[in-house]
């Protein structure tokens, strides 16, 4: 089954690569319209998925990732329209020039071909990935988690209906709707057909893909994100940033999980933090210093060492007091996932040092980690957030779904 999907996707990719920007945008507009027109069928499938997931004991954080609402689905359709408004990178000449040999050389952006995406309980990924792949002339094979297989199947049917209406092969966007996990292992070996693989899920999925895939893999999305409250931080705006980074949508990978507090500000800062977190319903996981300093009003539990590597994805926050900037940077290097980390400070020298020494895909000064997002970065819907360094890093927008080819123009030109 998968080989036939691969053959069809590869054939579709050749047709997609020839489309003009206008033709691709018309497809995306049709998809957005169909998502809204067929909203009832998608939401009905999603309700079944959510009910099944709840019966299976999924956490509230996972249920939040899984659930669609009319507002969320409308926002997904609007994200597709936003992709229409983005500049098409395909065909862009990156650089080039006339060589001494007389050969005119240019490096031009082209589609990757076929992209494979394996993801878990995130139904929005189906549309986000499909829209970005189509905009860049790529076909895509999707494998969502068993928790979302009804939602994904309904969504892909809508997308394929739009493709067919625009005269394009339905195989341009395909989904593996069989929840059998053995198919993941088979997909990881489809290097004959899939040009790049993107896993979006937990650490176990990323480890499996890195170790078993014969396809180039882009890993990331696991966010043990940190905020360091420097000794010079302005407490009031710092608290607003922390509340945003922790509570706006706790189930996302750009949510802060560990707060590092400089010891020189801890006595003034921790009581204010506890009050604010109590109002926000956040449970603090405090180190020994924090446990001694606080006695409410926020719920406070002792920090377990293994929790420093946790992606809680819930209203839980580690709080650790560090001696200085060196301690904060060392902690991030040991426990961070190179996703998103921030410093809150009024000392621009310390800010510059933090930016230079923290090796993450996104580093912020006096801002929330929640900004690490394709839409917030102006990239449109993102296909993933990469925490590796080769090919793509950070939110992966359109350019990350392209490669390039060298093109030489001659006039009977030969090598001497």
Curated annotation (Swiss-Prot):
Q: Which UniProt keyword terms apply here? A: Amino-acid biosynthesis, Cytoplasm, NADP, Oxidoreductase, Proline biosynthesis
A single GO CC term for this protein reads:
cytoplasm
Report the locations given in the UniProt record: Cytoplasm
State the Gene Ontology BP annotations.
L-proline biosynthetic process
Show the coiled coil region(s): none
Task: Name the pathway it acts in.
Answer: Amino-acid biosynthesis; L-proline biosynthesis; L-glutamate 5-semialdehyde from L-glutamate: step 2/2
Instruction: Give the molecular function GO annotations.
Output: glutamate-5-semialdehyde dehydrogenase activity; NADP binding
Q: In UniProt terms, what function does this protein have?
A: Catalyzes the NADPH-dependent reduction of L-glutamate 5-phosphate into L-glutamate 5-semialdehyde and phosphate. The product spontaneously undergoes cyclization to form 1-pyrroline-5-carboxylate.
Family statement drawn from the similarity comment of this UniProt entry: Belongs to the gamma-glutamyl phosphate reductase family.
Listed PANTHER family: DELTA-1-PYRROLINE-5-CARBOXYLATE SYNTHASE, GLUTAMATE SEMIALDEHYDE DEHYDROGENASE
Protein name, entry field = Gamma-glutamyl phosphate reductase
Organism of this sequence: Salmonella heidelberg (strain SL476)
Q: What lineage is this protein's organism placed in?
A: Bacteria, Pseudomonadati, Pseudomonadota, Gammaproteobacteria, Enterobacterales
Task: State which gene encodes it.
Answer: proA
